[in-house]
Amino acid sequence: MIRKYWWLVVFAVFVFLFDTLLMQWIELLATETDKCRNMNSVNPLKLVNCDELNFQDRM
């Protein structure tokens, strides 16, 4: 049976690897800027840009 459907196994592995790489690429594009947690805010779970926090610390 494996001899008959080897191409299907190869295709499934290829699709799995392609999907994994695609999701990693999308995640990399979506998070261009570094995100940090502002522990001094009302909602510390909300992610904000780290540059904004650094700017507030300087003032």
From Swiss-Prot:
Instruction: Identify its membrane topology class.
Output: Single-pass membrane protein
- Choose one Gene Ontology CC annotation of this protein and give it: plasma membrane
Q: Does the keyword Cell membrane apply?
A: yes
The record's keywords, sorted A to Z, are: Cell inner membrane, Cell membrane, Membrane, Transmembrane, Transmembrane helix
Q: Which residues cross the membrane?
A: 6-26
Q: Where in the cell is it found?
A: Cell inner membrane
Q: Where mainly located?
A: membrane
Name of the protein in question: Inner membrane protein YhdU
Per the UniProt record, the source organism is Escherichia coli (strain K12)
